[in-house]
Every structure is written in C-alpha cells, then in structure tokens.
Amino acid sequence: MNVQAIVDRVLPIFEAHKHEGDIEVEIRLGKHNGSLFDTNVGKDTWKRVLKGLKKYEGWESKKTSTVDMYYNDSNNVRITSDEDSGEQTMIQKISVVKEDFKCDPLDVRFCVAREIPTNGEYEMDRKRTKTRHSF
C-alpha cells in the first residue's frame, strides 16, 4: 500500500472541504466486491486496526459510543439514537466525493459527505445497533 500516494490524492480534497458546514470525512477499509465496497474485514483484522488507532497519541479526541441507527434508504435519511446521552439526530446524507484505492491486503475508500440536519416523517427501512469509534 502506497500511503503517500493516497495522502497526495486525498489531502487537496480534504483541504477543500474541511471548513464547510455539516461535512463528514470518513476513511474505510474493506474490499471491492463488484460495485459494492464491503467493509467486513473480519473480527481479527478489525481488532488489530482498532488497537493501532487507539494506540496513536495525536488524535484531537477519541470517542466510543453505542447507537441505534434507523435508515430510510430511498431518501438517504437516518436517525441516530445515542444510548448513553439520550440524544437523537436526524440527518440526510449526501455524498460529495468518493475516492477508492486498490491496495493489498485491504482496499481503502476516502469519502466526503454532507450530513444535513433534517426533520419530517419518514418510514424507516431498517435498524442497526452500532458501536462507533470516532477519532
């Protein structure tokens, strides 16, 4: 994996969007599976990556939370309910940029999305409970 080539390609994108409102920047590890990006890297790999991320001392902040997420896929709307804080948010996620990198052993996806706070009535298609690690 040529990390410098990835940084050279995504840093200008990050710099262009970092001061915009409601922006999410995400880096995902996984494998291209046809037209999908499959982030199921296996439990052992996930634990090794998470251990390495937690070890790094330079993060501005680290946060782990358990949330229930309800999705309306056709409108890209999701409700996040944080069990610890009781906070609920509803956002509409709009993809801004996706950059994919074929690497070995895992591929990398860099995403920028606009997460616009919204409200209204939506029928939710599915629910997932996630433990989220944010750095």
Task: Report residues per predicted region.
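Phosphate-end processing signature that detects enzymes handling 5′-triphosphorylated RNA
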Residues: 1-135
